[in-house]
Curated annotation (Swiss-Prot):
<keyword id="KW-0805">Transcription regulation</keyword>
<dbReference type="GO" id="GO:0045944">
    <property type="term" value="P:positive regulation of transcription by RNA polymerase II"/>
</dbReference>
<keyword id="KW-0804">Transcription</keyword>
<keyword id="KW-0539">Nucleus</keyword>
<comment type="function">
    <text>Transcription factor; part of the gene cluster that mediates the biosynthesis of iso-A82775C, a enylepoxycyclohexane and biosynthetic precursor of the chloropestolide anticancer natural products.</text>
</comment>
<dbReference type="Pfam" id="PF11951">
    <property type="entry name" value="Fungal_trans_2"/>
</dbReference>
<dbReference type="GO" id="GO:0003700">
    <property type="term" value="F:DNA-binding transcription factor activity"/>
</dbReference>
<dbReference type="InterPro" id="IPR021858">
    <property type="entry name" value="Fun_TF"/>
</dbReference>
<protein>
    <recommendedName>
        <fullName>Transcription factor iacI</fullName>
    </recommendedName>
</protein>
<dbReference type="GO" id="GO:0000976">
    <property type="term" value="F:transcription cis-regulatory region binding"/>
</dbReference>
<dbReference type="GO" id="GO:0005634">
    <property type="term" value="C:nucleus"/>
</dbReference>
Amino acid sequence: MSLLDLPTLWNASGVEALDSDLFEYFCCVASGSLPTFGHDATALRNILVRTALEGETASAAAVLQALLAFSSLHRYGLQPQALELKITALGSLAKGSFTPGLGTKETIEHIAAGMLLSSFEVHQSSCTSGHWTGYLGGVKTITDMSSVKTLLQFSSDVAVLLDWVHYHNVLARFSLLYWNGEETSEFPSTPTNLLSSQDSSLPPPIYSMMDLLSQICDLSNSAIPTGTSDEVDNYKGFLKVLDWRIRSLPIKGDNDGEMLLMKLYQLALLLFLNRSFEGLIDQPIRMQQQIGQAFAILPRLSSCRQQFPIYVIGCEARTDEQRAAVLDLITKTEKMSTSRSFNHCRTLLQAVWTQDDLAEWDDISYRAKLTLVISRCAVAPIFV
């Protein structure tokens, strides 16, 4: 695709000649590596590019600069050009924040810039990439203060942007359940489901998966009832309903690869729910069957860009064969131009396996196990 393929209402004159290469590279290549699940990659690219080029505000300039920074990082790795563009984007975003009473257009620009900056930080999963929580937390604060209905009325494809925000919010909450670092204070803890299923651009099963994962995180972050037997029974009943809802998800896809990926995500949700509430959900035979199904799927996938299912299922790997299947899928995925680094995911899995082999997890809860491992990271990981 060339710039001539972009809709004519986009005027790229705001892109400096030296940056036009990076702009086209973002449109053709780098945008495909933005962490998503179930999103239309072209639609996401389109709203980001349009937001960057249509506006004349400081926050619109921040979108363009953050877009170019991500493109530079994707193409050349972490080097001065990418860092300078990121710093320039932060300056423009700060300048735009002083505008009294952000309008709808400026709000969308702030959201787009913040998400691109967050994506910049998590792309390489390096020891300096811990600022993603601050950027994502800022985006969440803006969306919480905004009228979603007004944002959707501004443009039909804003739903794509808000779904992208929600996906990152949910996976961030999963990570921060087990993270003891300072970054947790930068991220608002209140769950937010930005869009109804009718307004969302996501396929219904994927929308439901994100909603169910969010609910499991809510429960994991709250105290388990220890009162009357009725309270405990009601709690167990709700967990069984969640388990049933996940198992009842209609798994559909345009091809076998999509269906296998969605099935893998479904199995990861079931395992996460069952492991998080061991003792309250007692179905060991069914869980072992689900683990077997998950490991049977791994070698059939050509790639899996989504890191949550790989991590959750990888934590169940006990044999060399199972671990090799996980690492092989990670390797195949990282060879794709649309993949981001699996550094954190791979390192965390290897730490879990080492401790499993040493039998150091006896009499320790699933939450304590994940907390011990994830909190060893220098910065909070995110499994998008």
